[in-house]
Amino acid sequence: MMTDPIADMFTRIRNGQSAAKVAVQMPSSKVKVAIATLLKEEGYISEFSVSGEVKPELAVTLKYFEGKEVIEKIKRVSRPGLRIYKSCDELPKVLAGMGIAIISTSKGLMTDRAARSAGIGGEVLGFVE
């Protein structure tokens, strides 16, 4: 049984890039698809797809630039044993705005910039640099 599926997703992406894999696969969920959508919109991954009906699998195609991984660091912040919630004013800036923080808000998952412009806070799921 997996206790933290988001941390598992981040670990699979981190390990896949360390091993210079083209793509990584993991069990799919709505939250993982939303995170993959954010990563694609921000240019951290090439693409993703969901396949299978009984046990859906999420395949994430990793992105490299001149042989180096695009995601230098991906880290889980809020975890099941210690949730981290921040208001709009307290939302963290990752690498002075060069990275993103993934925020779970009442309006869905969004980046720290989008949450700040919408004026809403939420749970800080992780950082991507």
Curated annotation (Swiss-Prot):
Gene Ontology CC: ribonucleoprotein complex; ribosome
Biological process (GO), any one: translation
First and last residue of the signal peptide: none
Keyword Transport on entry: no
Keywords on record: Ribonucleoprotein, Ribosomal protein, RNA-binding, rRNA-binding
TM region positions: none
GO molecular function, one term: structural constituent of ribosome
PANTHER family listed in its UniProt record: 40S RIBOSOMAL PROTEIN S15A
Family: Belongs to the universal ribosomal protein uS8 family.
Function, in words: One of the primary rRNA binding proteins, it binds directly to 16S rRNA central domain where it helps coordinate assembly of the platform of the 30S subunit.
Assembly notes: Part of the 30S ribosomal subunit. Contacts proteins S5 and S12.
Protein name: Small ribosomal subunit protein uS8
